[in-house]
């Protein structure tokens, strides 16, 4: 490294540049390779994961749009360079970063695509600096968004074809503001109808609507519960939704809400929109309470008042209340169990070097070895395909070399990636086949139209309803989706493993 005098770096806790959301060793590696003359060497990395969260049969890939915007705006500031000099990076490297723009290629699954273990979700091909330095942000973005979108499909009932109305209420329990915002976005894609987070709607628009009514503190502030109800109805006569369990649901909350609704009917007899829209319960036996509330409200002709429930709910509690207890709940507010994916809080996506472009334009495969077959990397510049059967459902995914092609009607001879498969050699009829790893950025330029949030939400719903086998959607012991390698990929993997490890993949 160049021996120069560096002034101490002055911290600034308000400073923010996403390009610096990077593990320090990324800079250490990139600086070293730069100093050894590899700045123009093109590397290929794949981002994939090894296990579905919550032992599911699938996951939802999410975060691609945020990643695209990050790469298109990738840059370093003088403050960044001063810090990197302070941390020991070379002056030449920092000067190179001063004008650096990301000019690589990004191939990825479309945001919202159902995905499976080992199949590449993202493929990066870029010069050394642009391939290495983006790893941390890429993984943070893709892992968290995919985790929450997947969890939301369970909580919203999309995955079991039993959709329920769910609002994302987890902002205050999220691990920081960015998790609250990104989590709200991913939850909406996964089937939620709204979020408690105002900034999320400001950032992403009306398809991520902020919703909510009152807290217990609002009710407690007034001399009586009825005073609180009346004040709220006076302020928002077309959006009256009230919390019933501040004092006593059935001795206080219910009688008062019935009385208030009668007052609204008397005051606005010709405006049916000015009525109590819903009531929420946040404690006690929610299933039993909802049934009792429904019966009482229906008995006085108020079947239009919806019942909302919240209180540390998740997909299992909701399903049990619906299936075994006959709960009469119209909508749910779900907080920490969704925004943290509490039952499985880590999406294990990894970012691995799989090829380096040589001077003659060909690609040299790269592979990390492991005694565990599940961690033996699939080397080479790869492409991902999905084969659909005659019913339009995903039959298997194929991992091929980038220059291999498949078309409808092909008979593909493949190698089953599952090490426990009885017969590793399979023959697949490609009734319909789609290339699922598609270009998003080429040579630093956006080459794909990014759909809006509603379109992505509908895309996820359509896949889970029509393009995924029900056996893969089972909550317990789901069918394992078939992932196959082309013989060329399998041979490359075997040859690399034998060369580096001295034996066959076991």
What are these regions (language model features)?
Residues 2-41, 51-53, 88, 92-106, ...:
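Buried, small/hydrophobic-residue-enriched core segments of structured protein domains
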Residues 36-99:
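N-terminal, Lys/Arg-enriched amphipathic/low-complexity engagement segments
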Residues 63-66, 147, 452, 456:
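Short amphipathic alpha-helical segments
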Residues 82-83, 150-154, 170, 472-478:
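Short coil/turn segments at secondary-structure boundaries
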Residues 2-41, 45, 50, 54-59, ...:
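Gly/Ser/Thr/Ala-enriched C-terminal appendages of enzymes
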Residues 277, 305-306:
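Short active-site oxyanion
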